[in-house]
Amino acid sequence: MKQATALDILKTGKNVFLTGSAGSGKTYTLNEYIHYLRARRVPVATTASTGIAATHMNGITIHSWSGIGIKDELTERDLVNLSRKKVLKDRLQETAVLIIDEISMLHAKQLNLVNQVLKHMRQNDKPFGGIQVVVAGDFFQLPPVGSRGESNRDKFAFMSQAWLDAGFKICYLSEQHRQQSGEGEDAQITLDNILNQIRGENGVSAAAIAALQNTFYQDVDVNRTRLYTHNVNVNKINEHELALLEGETVTYNAIAHGDNKLVETLKKSVRTSDELTLKTGAKVMFIKNNSELGVSNGTMGELIGFTTIKPLKLSIATIDDGSADEDGSAEALDEALETLEDAEALAQNESDKPLVSTDRYPIVRLNSGRQVIAEGEEWIVEDESGEILASYTQIPLTLAWAITIHKSQGMTLDAAEIDLSKTFELGQGYVALSRLKSLEGLKLLGMNDLSLRLDPLARGADSRFKDLSLEAQQAFEDIEREVLQESHERFVIASGGTLNKANIAAFEKEYKNRKKKQAQKLAQKDKLSNQLSDHSESTLMATRILLEESLSIAEIAQSRGLAQSTIMGHVARLRRQDPSLNCEHLRPDEAILNKVSKAVDAIIAAGDPNDFNAADDSTQSVKGGDDFDKQRIKLRPIYEYLKQQIDYNTIRLALVFID
């Protein structure tokens, strides 16, 4: 099926499963549909089964969006507790279209839970509470990790009751858009060819196997990612590479509390070490989602140093690009951090997370170029009443010169060294190879008899999906264009959207202008990078230049490759330095300002020391009295006072404008 046909089906409001081989344009088609909905003001939620896939969609995980977390069952009491979360309830009730990307990695039980929660929250017994659900993915990817003894039949989402109830229309995309052609020694054999042969029913040709084997002799990028089937190989390589580094070493000892068996279960799910040793120069990967920090489970980078900042600042502080000297030492970063006068505004999270047993924390330069500080994260197990039964706290990083194939799902790699000689699960080889853009980026160390084989259940389902997609295509081709257009319009109206041409045109114009501005900002960012030094005042000036162009917080953050909360911190400092600074375009609604101001006054009046950060030179140098207290006030008490109805970033921004 072509993308245009799939979009026509999506616009009717039918529940849809969008699938196809790697590079067939699933994500592109989803983004086109999301753009169509937003132009018509139809409330759409973009989610994915994993953190790294969610970042590709500029969304969040389905687990977080729906409130199911990591559970695989929900009691009536659980549902009642979820209903009490106003933000969650409002979100689920207001959504008209739910998109779930990488559906292959969502367990059947969890799809059932999403269905259960939506029915409960929306008080609607129709599948998924009556909203349109669009799931996308490729079931030739590895299935989600399940309980011991579970078969793939138990795990695949298409085997769930929710899937059957939804009655998904199948859109199987057949065009190729990612894999590059004309590669390798034999121009007739491309990675696209090989992947399609693996998916096909006739097996992989001798020429394709030879093309793969010939990559053993290729020299690929020295910064390549290494993919292995087993953790033992991954650990061996990572430990070897770590030993070669001569940089500063810090070891983090995890902290565990509660029931021993539950703690062990947490450790297995976290997949990190009780004793985590890191060095400057290490390749690392985050192992827990942190939307406020801007990282996902699977985000990769390089450890460029360690810092000894206060715990509150550390968990969430983001460091400006270029704040380290060329050798990546931490001293320049420490100096830059110490100059920050408004640590609270730079905080990415005010949850007072527990600390692991050290006072030095990793500074990671992400592959995107942004730099962040990683603080200890806590994983917990709760009972039905919310009481914590077990907890495990560790720095959410793992060494990442090598990673398992399972962990690589959702990534797109320019170069990789892959060892399939110990393949033990059907589909591992396909997943590993489909991470790459071309054969030119592949160095294959070995294969075995399982490496190029796929799960029979997935293969059978895929064949059925193709047949159902053809049926859907033929059915829609018989519908007259005018009738189809009327169907599209009915769904928009039923979803609370608009057909007003002027409004749609205004959205499209704004969208084009935003794209144009983004291109200009990228050019401006490059110019600033060449002009500005690595000092704090220079990075403030870079933000000010963009601010004076009336760009939004999000636009400035994207342009500079920084977190939005970091930019808010810059705005706060700039406004204190120059109260006449023109940033009124960022000013929140008066109703929000009044609510935040009232909360601040109440918290200051209560005078609970736990609601304030410890004083330091930077805060004392600003003002005294109530203004001094306002500078030190934590975000969490404000958030709680407002009953979680105003998000952290809006509170941060409001504080800038409260006198």
From Swiss-Prot:
UniProtKB keywords: ATP-binding, DNA damage, DNA recombination, DNA repair, DNA-binding, Helicase, Hydrolase, Isomerase, Nucleotide-binding
Record SMART domains: AAA
SUPFAM superfamilies hit by this protein: P-loop containing nucleoside triphosphate hydrolases (SSF52540)
Domain of life of the native organism: Bacteria
Reactions that this protein is recorded to catalyse: Couples ATP hydrolysis with the unwinding of duplex DNA at the replication fork by translocating in the 5'-3' direction. This creates two antiparallel DNA single strands (ssDNA). The leading ssDNA polymer is the template for DNA polymerase III holoenzyme which synthesizes a continuous strand; ATP + H2O = ADP + phosphate + H(+)
Gene Ontology molecular function terms on file: ATP binding; ATP hydrolysis activity; DNA binding; DNA helicase activity
Database matches in Pfam families: HTH_40, PIF1
GO biological process, one term: telomere maintenance
The keyword Isomerase belongs to this UniProt entry's keyword annotation: yes
This enzyme's EC code(s): 5.6.2.3
Aminoacyl-tRNA synthetase in keyword set: no
Cofactor(s), names only, from the UniProt record: Mg(2+)
Function as written in the Swiss-Prot or TrEMBL entry: DNA-dependent ATPase and 5'-3' DNA helicase that efficiently unwinds G-quadruplex (G4) DNA structures. May be involved in resolving commom issues that arise during DNA replication, recombination, and repair.
Family: Belongs to the helicase family. PIF1 subfamily.
Self-association and partners: Monomer.
Protein name (database record): ATP-dependent DNA helicase Pif1
